[in-house]
């Protein structure tokens, strides 16, 4: 096995003596940094069918707190995966939708979902490996 170090402008990876702030061990690390975590993938999947307001996203992911949803939306917007659109109305209306970059992640998340269905619950419940 070998380790490939890649530099990606605009991304901050490990900091330390051995690696610069924009280096990752591999491109998988970049992807996990962008879409990893407990909530990012769920928010992205929730937005795959179109624009939603904060309250609608919160309703569709009932276990996420408002504070964590706010933080997750900000991180996804900062990464360029979602767009936040503020409408000049009273009361204010804000909608979130996937960017092209965000849409490009959906097939990957769909594949992870299928993998989870195939191996996750089957192994937990029966102790057997799925086909």
From Swiss-Prot:
It comes from the Archaea. Coiled coil: none annotated. GO terms for molecular function: DNA binding. The keyword Membrane does not apply. The keyword DNA-binding applies. Keywords: DNA-binding, Transcription, Transcription regulation. This is Uncharacterized HTH-type transcriptional regulator MTH_1285. It comes from Methanothermobacter thermautotrophicus (strain ATCC 29096 / DSM 1053 / JCM 10044 / NBRC 100330 / Delta H) (Methanobacterium thermoautotrophicum).
């Amino acid at each position: 096995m070998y380790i490939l170090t890649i530099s990606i402008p605009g991304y901050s990876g490990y900091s330390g003596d051995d690696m610069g702030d924009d280096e990752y061990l591999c491109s998988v690390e970049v992807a996990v940094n962008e879409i990893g975590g407990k909530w990012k993938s769920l928010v992205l999947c929730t937005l795959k069918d179109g624009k939603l307001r904060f309250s609608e996203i919160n309703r569709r992911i009932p276990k996420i707190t408002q504070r964590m949803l706010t933080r997750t939306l900000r991180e996804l917007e900062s990464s360029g995966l979602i767009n936040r659109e503020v409408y000049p109305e009273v009361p204010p209306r804000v909608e979130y939708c996937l960017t092209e970059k965000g849409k490009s992640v959906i097939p990957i998340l769909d594949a992870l979902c299928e993998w989870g269905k195939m191996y996750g619950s089957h192994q937990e419940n029966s102790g057997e490996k799925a086909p």
